[in-house]
Amino acid sequence: MGEQPIFTTRAHVFQIDPNTKKNWMPASKQAVTVSYFYDVTRNSYRIISVDGAKVIINSTITPNMTFTKTSQKFGQWADSRANTVFGLGFSSEQQLTKFAEKFQEVKEAAKIAKDKTQEKIETSSNHSQESGRETPSSTQASSVNGTDDEKASHAGPANTHLKSENDKLKIALTQSAANVKKWEIELQTLRESNARLTTALQESAASVEQWKRQFSICRDENDRLRNKIDELEEQCSEINREKEKNTQLKRRIEELEAELREKETELKDLRKQSEIIPQLMSECEYVSEKLEAAERDNQNLEDKVRSLKTDIEESKYRQRHLKVELKSFLEVLDGKIDDLHDFRRGLSKLGTDN
């Protein structure tokens, strides 16, 4: 078309099955580009999608179209001119919401464009009718009010102007008649398409009711199966609990058997020990006698130690006494030595005097 897209997104394209009017048929193998365009030549808005070289959507938006969200990621609209229903599957709910909002905006713009076109057509039609009514009256007025001389002087230019106006009116009337015929055909096509779409919608409604009944049956069956699954899971839980109890009992039995084997081993050891008890008793008596003898020897040694301690104390006492006596003797000796020195000095002095 040579126009830039107003809005572009990507989606999986589907069309309703023309035979059953119930099932969706994929129009694209993968997500393709879906765009809104404004057709300047026809003053209309279109939704166009191309998969490679194949045009899979070329839908003209009209004010009576409605885009319906049927799930979180799927929406559809009916195209009466194409006699089909388009469906789009998006990768996210956000993309679906944006597409639906843009559809509403474009539908409002299409309504405004249609109203303007209708006003232009009505204005053109009214102008043609007024021109057709005014032409005879003006001719009549000129013939009544004018004189023979005036008729002669103005006949040439007036006829030329009237012919030109008549030619324009003929062309306008021809175009209007052609447009009216075209609109009648388009209106009849729209009525037939609306009738087919109404039938398809009624069949779809019946199919929806049937799907609802089937869904209700499936839901009841699903609930029954879920309850059965819950019962089986409960039974499995009980079986697992019993298995766990059995495992615990087996483990306890193994532990008790191990303890029993240990007790039997201890009993054997005790029996072996009981066989050597008499020998141990005799050895114990022998050791007791040795212990008593050692205790007696120890007692004797302790007595000797106490005696030696007494002797040591007495020896220390005598040493202290001897030290005192020795000290007194030394003091006396020192005094005697001092006296002897004094006596020598006296003798020396006497010898000197003689």
UniProtKB/Swiss-Prot annotation:
The WH1 domain interacts with the PPXXF motif in GRM1, GRM5, RYR1, RYR2, ITPR1, SHANK 1 and SHANK3. It is linked to Deafness, autosomal dominant, 68: A form of non-syndromic sensorineural hearing loss with postlingual onset. Sensorineural deafness results from damage to the neural receptors of the inner ear, the nerve pathways to the brain, or the area of the brain that receives sound information. Residues 112-166 are annotated as: Disordered. It is found in: Cytoplasm; Cell membrane; Postsynaptic density; Synapse. CDD domains: EVH1_Homer_Vesl. Gene3D superfamilies: 1.20.5.1700, Pleckstrin-homology domain (PH domain)/Phosphotyrosine-binding domain (PTB). This is Homer protein homolog 2. GO terms for biological process: behavioral response to cocaine; calcium-mediated signaling; G protein-coupled glutamate receptor signaling pathway; negative regulation of calcineurin-NFAT signaling cascade; negative regulation of interleukin-2 production; regulation of G protein-coupled receptor signaling pathway; regulation of store-operated calcium entry; sensory perception of sound. It comes from Homo sapiens. The keyword Cell membrane applies. Residues 92-122, 160-329 form a coiled coil. SUPFAM superfamilies: PH domain-like (SSF50729). The gene is HOMER2. It comes from the Eukaryota. Forms coiled-coil structures that mediate homo- and heteromultimerization. Interacts with NFATC2; interaction is reduced by AKT activation. Interacts with NFATC1 and NFATC4. Interacts with DAGLA (via PPXXF motif); this interaction is required for the cell membrane localization of DAGLA. Residues 123-146 have a biased composition (Polar residues). GO terms for molecular function: actin binding; G protein-coupled glutamate receptor binding; synaptic receptor adaptor activity. Belongs to the Homer family. Residues 1-110 form the WH1 domain. Postsynaptic density scaffolding protein. Binds and cross-links cytoplasmic regions of GRM1, GRM5, ITPR1, DNM3, RYR1, RYR2, SHANK1 and SHANK3. By physically linking GRM1 and GRM5 with ER-associated ITPR1 receptors, it aids the coupling of surface receptors to intracellular calcium release. May also couple GRM1 to PI3 kinase through its interaction with AGAP2. Isoforms can be differently regulated and may play an important role in maintaining the plasticity at glutamatergic synapses. Required for normal hearing. Negatively regulates T cell activation by inhibiting the calcineurin-NFAT pathway. Keywords: Cell membrane, Cell projection, Coiled coil, Cytoplasm, Deafness, Disease variant, Hearing, Membrane, Non-syndromic deafness, Synapse. Its main location: cytoplasm. Residues 112-122 have a biased composition (Basic and acidic residues). GO terms for cellular component: apical part of cell; cytoplasm; cytosol; dendrite; glutamatergic synapse; intracellular organelle; plasma membrane; postsynaptic density.
